[in-house]
UniProtKB/Swiss-Prot annotation:
Protein name: StAR-related lipid transfer protein 7, mitochondrial
GO cellular component: cytoplasm; extracellular region; mitochondrion
Function: May play a protective role in mucosal tissues by preventing exaggerated allergic responses.
Pfam family, one: START
Entry-linked SMART domains: START
Deletion consequences: The viability of homozygous knockout embryos is dramatically decreased after 10.0 dpc. Surviving animals have a normal life expectancy, but males are infertile. Ovalbumin sensitization and challenge of heterozygous mice results in a significant increase in pulmonary inflammation, mucous cell metaplasia, airway hyperresponsiveness and ovalbumin-specific IgE compared with wild-type animals. This exacerbation is associated with an increase in CD4(+) IL13(+) T helper cells, as well as an increase IL4, IL5 and IL13 cytokine production in lungs.
Region feature Disordered, mapped onto this chain: 118-141, 347-373
InterPro entries to which the protein is assigned, alphabetical: START-like_dom_sf, START_lipid-bd_dom, START_lipid_transfer, START_STARD7
Domain START: 115-330
Residue(s) at site: Cleavage: A80, A81
Tissue expression from the record: Expressed in epithelial cells of airways, peripheral bronchioles and alveoli, as well as in the basal cell layer of the epidermis (at protein level).
Any one GO BP annotation for this protein: type 2 immune response
Coiled-coil segments on the chain, per record: 89-114
Length: 373
């Protein structure tokens, strides 16, 4: 159609009037085709919305998503964005993430027992990895630095490689509340709105029927003169009665139902892992906990200012959580029990029969394991 031209000549021709007109025509054609396909997709979505229930639509979209995942490029991401669907296959918290947090607690306990038996009371912040571990990954991790050392509260931090941020780790003990009470108060979003004065908004956006993960939107006040921050994150917890341990893992995600608001600063980098080890049982006073935390609050303040805010804010939050647990215990405030017997019974029934698609998460739990969020 066009004569062959050298690249430089072609670029000059496209920059001219005739070339500009051609590019404009191509752009208009692309906009027309894209708009037509988006309208067709919306019409199809409305049709399926009338024909199928919400659970059926989610299952259908899930199958469609799995087919798209094998295609090259960003077709699957684009389709998820256009349809306003949160892709659980990519974002749910996996069993491996929960187990990694529990393993960190075990390593810390093993090393602290060695130190105590040798007459040293300090808890080591970073136990050595087992022999044969990945040496490269160890080299990339910075050493932990003690920030606060009290009898029942120890706080460390370490730089996150390639950033100006720190990761924080707390190892602590409470002896006047039960693990069940402490765990339930931490998970109960409605009760937190009452005891945490910094909360502006806290609600569950979506739940995953497969893993029990939840997506939450949390808006919180930050110290003056900073703007309030908002977090969109997925969380999942697991309670292992056989091994006497409970774990809660959270991390930031993007969700189409919660677009960024100009009123708040969106925190896009956030991770938290809490592991609780009862001294005796879930319903007797006394437990140890390990909290590992990091986030990027998107501030312009120097690194030492941010570190000071987190280092002082973390003990304050944990003490408020502890006091809220005591208040709920002493005043018999009703708090949702996340460690109920019902999920355990359902899990045992599912194990005895062939698991159905709707009960994958129940069938995958052991007879002495509760898992829900």
């Amino acid at each position: 159609m066009f004569p062959r031209r050298p690249p430089a000549t072609l670029a000059a021709w496209l920059a001219g009037a005739r070339g500009g007109g051609l590019l404009s025509a191509l752009a208009n054609q692309c906009r027309f085709v894209t708009g037509l396909r988006v309208r067709r997709a919306q019409q199809i979505a409305q049709l399926y919305g009338r024909l199928y229930s919400e659970s059926s639509r989610c299952a259908l979209l899930g199958r469609f998503w799995r087919r798209l995942r094998g295609r090259p490029g960003h077709a699957s991401v684009l389709m998820a964005a256009l349809s306003g669907v949160f892709v659980w296959d990519e974002e749910r918290i996996q069993e491996e993430e929960l187990q990694r947090s529990i393993n960190e607690m075990k390593r810390l306990e093993e090393m602290s027992n060695i130190f105590q038996s040798s007459g040293v009371e300090n808890y080591p912040p970073e136990p050595k990895s087992p022999a044969g571990g990945n040496e490269k990954s160890k080299d990339k991790e910075e050493p932990w630095e003690m920030v606060m050392d009290k009898k029942h509260f120890k706080l460390w931090r370490r730089p996150i490689t390639g950033t100006h941020l720190y990761q924080y780790r707390v190892f602590g003990t409470y002896t006047d509340v039960t693990p069940r009470q402490f765990f339930n108060v931490q998970l109960d979003t409605e009760y937190r709105k009452k005891w945490d004065a910094l909360v502006i908004k806290l609600e569950v956006i979506e739940r995953d029927a497969v893993s029990g993960s939840e997506v939450l939107h949390w808006v919180t006040h930050f110290p003056y003169p900073m703007y309030s921050r908002d977090y969109v994150y997925v969380r999942r917890y697991s309670v292992d009665q056989e091994n006497n341990v409970m774990v809660l893992v959270s991390r930031a995600v993007e969700h189409p139902s919660v677009p960024e608001s100009p009123e708040f600063v969106r925190v896009r980098s956030y991770e938290s892992q809490m592991v609780i080890r009862p001294h005796k049982s879930f319903d007797e006073n006394g437990f140890d906990y390990l909290l590992t935390y990091s986030d990027n609050p998107q501030t312009v303040f120097p690194r030492y200012c941010v570190s000071w805010m987190v280092s002082s804010g973390m003990p304050d939050f944990l003490e408020k959580l502890h006091m809220a647990t005591l208040k709920a215990k002493n005043m018999e405030i009703k708090v949702k029990d996340y460690i109920s017997a019902k999920p355990l019974e359902m899990s045992s029934e599912a194990k005895a029969t062939a698991p159905s698609p709707e009960r994958k998460n129940e069938g995958s739990c052991g007879p002495a394991r509760i898992e829900y969020a």
